[in-house]
Amino acid sequence: MIPLKMLLLVTLLLGASLQVTHAARGTNVGRECCLEYFKGAIPISRLTRWYKTSGECPKDAIVFVTVQGKSICSDPKDKRVKKAVRYLQRTWKGGPQES
């Protein structure tokens, strides 16, 4: 019976340490990360700016900000996303706009 108690204790401690590690990593990650990409049509005429998510984020993403201040997470490899970025670069004469 002692090995079962020891196994339970080790499992409990391991689970608790993983939760602490996960929370700490989340704190150090940038202000905003995208967990999934928007799959609909990108309203190009309603976009005001764009930026790339932090390299520390689990997924590379381009974030578009609309005139209403809403953020749209997008796949940087998607041709519609590339088209929207080119549009904003021509409109604003530059690269990613800082938030």
Curated annotation (Swiss-Prot):
PROSITE patterns hit by this protein = SMALL_CYTOKINES_CC
CDD domains noted in UniProt: Chemokine_CC
Kindly indicate whether the keyword Signal belongs to this entry: yes
Q: Where in the cell is it found?
A: Secreted
Q: Quick one: a GO cellular component term?
A: extracellular space
Q: Name one GO molecular function term.
A: chemokine activity
Summarizing the function annotation, the protein's role is:
Chemokine, which displays chemotactic activity for T lymphocytes, preferentially Th2 cells, but not monocytes or granulocytes. Therefore plays an important role in a wide range of inflammatory and immunological processes. Acts by binding to CCR4 at T-cell surface. Mediates GM-CSF/CSF2-driven pain and inflammation. In the brain, required to maintain the typical, highly branched morphology of hippocampal microglia under homeostatic conditions.
Supply the name of the protein: C-C motif chemokine 17
> What is the source species?
Canis lupus familiaris (Dog)
Q: Does the keyword Chaperone apply?
A: no
Residue pairs linked by disulfide bridges in the UniProt entry? C33-C57, C34-C73
- Homology family: Belongs to the intercrine beta (chemokine CC) family.
Q: Which domain of life is it from?
A: Eukaryota
One matching Pfam family? IL8
Q: Which residues, if any, are the signal sequence?
A: 1-23
Question: What keywords are annotated for this sequence in UniProt?
Answer: Chemotaxis, Cytokine, Disulfide bond, Inflammatory response, Secreted, Signal
Q: What is the annotated tissue distribution of the protein whose record heads this document?
A: Expressed in thymus, spleen, lymph node, lung and heart.
Q: Which GO terms describe its biological process?
A: immune response; inflammatory response
